[in-house]
């Protein structure tokens, strides 16, 4: 059989088509103990500028504040591998997404050592989305989750209080980057009245206002390029309104006041001895 291979990646993907010799395997098995105990994040940088791992280190060191530091390895094609010796660092960094560099998105994945690096797709990223315009009677975390589950994977919060901003609720969602950001949702209430619920995203990096994708900016969009500059900016379907205002966790703005006679009933009847003394 004649087999042509243009790259090492082709060979890795098509080895099943080869007739392997005795020296080529199978025969070598690797166990968990053979691997290095480390925890990694693979990242893809969507900036068009050339990457410098020194600048990356200078940018993220004060933001991540890793106690034991971390290692950065360039993988080419604007991809980088961050390696830590503490799993808690990886968990904390991924929980704090989204991250940006040069104002452009940095898509991150927890890297498992069993996965070949070229198989990483960087198809999703996590964002905090604020939900605006929900009628007051429907302002619950359960309702917000129901709305968001239609358009994304909801990352359920450990503490529901993290979702409460008083007049607005928010959730952490995982979005498919091959799709445009969702601007909102037309919700039908039980009386058949329709209301528009707006989505606003926290710490949103640069995005394309023509198509709503996070992977490029306006000047690199196919819609703009194909128009040969004939489109007007007021024809853009997306805009700064997607950016959320600063989120402030709700303080204790609501308290439950017991009925007027509740405390009196708990206290019981007046002491008769006091009446006698009077």
Regions flagged by a language model, labelled:
Residues 105, 128, 170-172, 184-186, ...:
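Well-ordered beta-strand positions in beta-sheet-rich domains
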Residues 75-83, 163-172, 205:
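The conserved glycine-aromatic submotif of the RRM
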Residues 1-68, 165, 183-278:
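Long, low-complexity intrinsically disordered regions
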Residues 1-128, 133-140, 157-160, 185:
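Nucleic acid-contacting regions in RNA/DNA-associated proteins
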Residues 131-133, 175-177, 201-203, 212:
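Short, structured patches in soluble enzyme cores that scaffold and shape functional sites
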Residues 88, 92, 139-154, 216-222:
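Classical protein tyrosine phosphatase
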Residues 158-182:
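BRCT (BRCA1 C-terminal) domain core and associated BRCT-interaction motifs
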């Amino acid at each position: 059989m004649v087999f042509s291979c243009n790259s090492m990646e082709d060979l890795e993907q098509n080895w099943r088509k080869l007739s392997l010799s005795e020296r080529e395997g199978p025969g070598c098995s690797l166990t968990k103990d053979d691997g290095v105990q480390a925890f990694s994040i693979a990242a893809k940088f969507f900036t068009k500028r050339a990457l410098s791992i020194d600048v990356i280190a200078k940018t993220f060191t004060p933001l991540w504040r890793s106690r034991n530091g971390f290692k950065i390895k360039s993988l080419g094609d604007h991809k980088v591998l961050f390696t830590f010796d503490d799993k808690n660092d990886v968990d904390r960094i991924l929980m704090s997404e989204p991250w940006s560099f040069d104002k452009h998105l940095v898509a991150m994945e927890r890297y498992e050592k069993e996965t070949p690096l070229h198989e990483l797709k960087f198809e999703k990223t996590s964002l905090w989305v604020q939900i605006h315009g929900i009628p007051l009677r429907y302002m619950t975390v359960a309702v917000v989750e129901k709305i968001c589950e239609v358009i994304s994977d909801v990352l359920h919060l450990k503490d529901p209080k993290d979702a409460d901003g008083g007049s607005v609720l928010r959730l952490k969602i995982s979005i498919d980057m091959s799709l445009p950001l969702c601007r909102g949702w037309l919700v039908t209430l039980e009386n058949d009245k329709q209301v528009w619920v707006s989505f606003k995203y926290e710490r949103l990096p640069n995005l394309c206002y023509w198509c709503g994708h996070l992977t490029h900016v306006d000047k690199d969009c196919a819609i703009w390029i194909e128009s040969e500059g004939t489109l007007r900016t007021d024809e853009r379907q997306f805009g700064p309104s997607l950016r959320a205002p600063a989120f402030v966790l709700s303080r204790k703005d609501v308290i439950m006041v017991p009925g007027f006679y509740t405390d009196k009933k708990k206290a019981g009847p007046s002491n008769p001895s006091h009446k006698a003394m009077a």
